[in-house]
């Protein structure tokens, strides 16, 4: 027969063993959860790295598109300035610049517009006009720096009277912005309907 004291220790050891088994099982569960968490965390890090790379790629593409857009806008402004400048030359000189495959002798004079501004008349009966003209140099031979300078262009092609009108209208503008504004103003106010029609026909060639 087991003595009470010995039975007590046996029961105590059995309880301790059961408690140890419980602790071991809890530790196993914790390790499984840790492993699962680490896998999930690694997957998250991988997705984050992929997302960060995609964001960087998008940013690079955006910067490239912005640079390309700025280049296109600059070139467009220069080309628009060239077109506006040639329209002003047409109005001031009364003779269109030669179109492609057309010689200067073949170019027909534009009719005078109904304005109070002084404009030169096309030569008649082989006689040259007594009114002094501005230099009709083809504006397409201008350099980019000249396109950017409204004053350079205006001194070469515009009469003092028209320059005074434009100075009053666009005193707050400079450079290409002013050149565009002057060209649009003159196109809208100085060109006759017939002149506009002829210019549009020329630009289609």
Curated annotation (Swiss-Prot):
Induction: Expressed in the early phase of the viral replicative cycle. One of its GO terms (cellular component) is host cell cytoplasm. One of its GO terms (biological process) is symbiont-mediated activation of host autophagy. Residues 10-75 form a coiled coil. Keywords: Activation of host autophagy by virus, Coiled coil, Host cytoplasm, Host-virus interaction. Residues 112-138 have a biased composition (Polar residues). The keyword Coiled coil applies. The keyword Coiled coil applies. Residues 111-138 are annotated as: Disordered. It comes from the Viruses. Its main location: host cell. Belongs to the asfivirus K205R family. This is Uncharacterized protein K205R. It comes from African swine fever virus (isolate Tick/South Africa/Pretoriuskop Pr4/1996).
């Amino acid at each position: 027969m087991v003595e009470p004291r010995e039975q007590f220790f046996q029961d105590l050891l059995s309880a301790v063993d059961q408690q140890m088994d419980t602790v071991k099982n809890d530790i196993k569960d914790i390790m499984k959860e840790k492993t699962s968490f680490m896998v999930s965390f690694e997957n998250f890090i991988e997705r984050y790295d992929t997302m960060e790379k995609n964001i960087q790629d998008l940013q690079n593409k955006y910067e490239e598109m912005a640079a390309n857009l700025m280049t296109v806008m600059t070139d467009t402004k220069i080309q628009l300035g060239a077109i506006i400048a040639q329209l002003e030359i047409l109005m001031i000189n009364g003779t269109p610049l030669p179109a492609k495959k057309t010689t200067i002798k073949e170019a027909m004079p534009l009719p005078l517009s109904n304005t109070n501004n002084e404009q030169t008349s096309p030569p008649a009966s082989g006689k040259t006009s007594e009114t002094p003209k501005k230099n009709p140099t083809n504006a397409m031979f201008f350099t980019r720096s000249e396109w950017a300078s409204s004053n350079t262009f205006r001194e070469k092609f515009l009469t003092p009277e028209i320059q005074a009108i434009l100075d009053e209208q666009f005193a707050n503008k400079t450079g290409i912005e002013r050149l565009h504004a002057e060209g649009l103003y003159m196109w809208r106010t100085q060109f006759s309907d017939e002149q506009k029609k002829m210019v549009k026909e020329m630009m289609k060639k």
